[in-house]
Amino acid sequence: MGAGGHARVVLDVLRLRGYQLLGICAPELPAGSKWHGVDVLGDDTVLDDLSCDEVWLANGIGLAQRGMVRRRIQDAYFSRGYSWLTLEHPSSLRASDSWLADGVQLMAGAVVQPGCRLESGVVINTCASVDHDCQLGEHVFVGPGAVLCGAVKVDRGAFIGAGAVVLPGIHLGEDAIIGAGAVVIRSVGAGCTAVGNPARNR
């Protein structure tokens, strides 16, 4: 699903992991064309002709509209019985007792430490790290190089920008936004945006 920058990163992981690619769904591209060597099938309605027992889906949709399209598509096809691949780049590291739901994506250099729980649709981007006992709700996006220290709790849909640091035990509420490079020293409420060092609500 998708044909933007995030989709290219997902495509790279799929190829490194040896998956057989049927094609991509991307309404902005003409059906029957090629995208980075992959067949363009059309928009997501082409899945109506494919049994959920025959295919796995990979979510390459990025964060346009704060990721709402990404969430809507993933949740809709989950509810119809389709499975979303959990993708782990070969250079990512995760502890054996960490738990990943379907549809989680660990990109190159990502680290997930012991006791972590990552719910469906979470993205841990390039070289980001999630330390021990963190809990990340559905569709949380951790940007490149961000650091979550131990026992951080992040609710559904929150966004943590590139290079941000979240100190131990902090709670980020649903749909909270943490700006790039922010240092979060206190909890951030649902729907709030925090930026700066130390991070303050904007």
Predicted features and spans:
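Cofactor-binding loop segments of dinucleotide-utilizing enzymes, especially the Rossmann-like FAD-
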Residues: 3, 26-27, 62, 89, ...
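Hydrophobic, well-ordered beta-alpha structural blocks that scaffold small-molecule cofactor pockets
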Residues: 1-38, 43-51
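Conserved acidic residues
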Residues: 22, 55-56, 102, 156
